[in-house]
UniProtKB/Swiss-Prot annotation:
Lineage of the species this protein comes from: Eukaryota, Metazoa, Chordata, Craniata, Vertebrata
Cell compartments where the protein resides: Cytoplasm
An individual GO BP term: retinol metabolic process
Reactions this protein catalyses: a primary alcohol + NAD(+) = an aldehyde + NADH + H(+); a secondary alcohol + NAD(+) = a ketone + NADH + H(+)
Binding residue positions for NAD(+): G200, L201, G202, G203, V204, G205, D224, K229, V293, G294, L295, R370
Primary location recorded for the protein, binned into one broad class: cytoplasm
Keyword terms, alphabetized: Cytoplasm, Metal-binding, NAD, Oxidoreductase, Phosphoprotein, Zinc
UniProt organism field: Pongo abelii
Function: Alcohol dehydrogenase. Catalyzes the NAD-dependent oxidation of primary alcohols to the corresponding aldehydes. Oxidizes secondary alcohols to the corresponding ketones.
Protein name per the record: Alcohol dehydrogenase 6
InterPro entries: ADH-like_C (IPR013149), ADH-like_N (IPR013154), ADH_Zn_CS (IPR002328), GroES-like_sf (IPR011032), NAD(P)-bd_dom_sf (IPR036291), PKS_ER (IPR020843)
Record-listed Zn(2+) 2 binding positions: C99, C102, C105, C113
Keyword rRNA-binding attached: no
Binding residues for Zn(2+) 1: C47, H69, C175
Subunit structure: Dimer.
Amino acid sequence: MSTTGQVIRCKAAILWKPGAPFSIEEVEVAPPKAKEVRIKVVATGLCGTEMKVLGSKHLDLLYPTILGHEGAGIVESIGEGVSTVKPGDKVITLFLPQCGECTSCLNSEGNFCIQFKQSETQLMSDGTSRFTCKGKSIYHFGNTSTFCEYTVIKEISVAKIDAVAPLEKVCLISCGFSTGFGAAINTAKVTPGSTCAVFGLGGVGSSVVMGCKAAGATRIIGVDVNKEKFKKARELGATECLNPQDLKKPIQEVLFDMTDAGIDFCFEAIGNLDVLAAALASCNESYGVCVVVGLLPASVQLKISGQLFFSGRSLKGSVFGGWKSRQHIPKLVADYMAKKLNLDPLITHTLNLDKINEAVELMKTGKCIRCILLL
């Protein structure tokens, strides 16, 4: 029986309040309105962004909410005016929209669509939610809310992909892989023969390693306090790995000693201000580039000596790896299907949605790179 135009009852993982575990609940998902798409979510990754939400009571979020932004699924129905996808299409959800009309979308170097700011309201464009549970409205998250069997997303936050793409794999292209890989390829523009250092070897950092290797870097140094991640990092392209806790000197001094002149391209893939300062200080004084990939706390001010920039170092931000979301994501999926990209090593665990709190523990203890949740 068709569900088009009907309210759908399904399972979702809800955060009822800050610091609480996920609660599996039955929710009601309303039909899509104009320019909206309702999607049957098939697979979604548990990203570091969600881990930061779970680990902080200070983020400016509204509760209760349905998290999740690294998703892939199948279009169930579409609202009035939707023209780029149809029911049955396989799609990837996009936390970063591409409206195609704002100055960032129209600039060849920009990808931070102005419509992203709509996500800060945690509601749809009309100021309402499409989710209810126990008679209570549930807030959206990151334009996507993929920790729900069905979700409603604006058309500009949906990318149609290859009809035979394995959704349990390519969901990583929705955030983690694209963010890290693109930070090396697009933002830093890593050059052949260069030296790179990646601070943080989780899902995003591991993807940075892959991007550095693809760009032709000859020396890729992974930095992490969890030695268990070193084997995987080397498999992905890291030539050396360091644990700062094992060193007798600060990591930036060690990296200078190892390279004589500092690192060409450094990447901070954790979201830690102290690590960012160390990464910047590790860069070659004259032309080194440090790229901020990790999600830094908005409430904390960055304090770095201006002397670090005097000689020529540069610090760059990167969102979604510099990709224009709707334009580039289908191409990345096509590259995966053509075996030009390999996402499989990043996926260390696969669990059902009702095991989401187990996935959280795996992430907290550093036992997984990426856990995929099946819905």
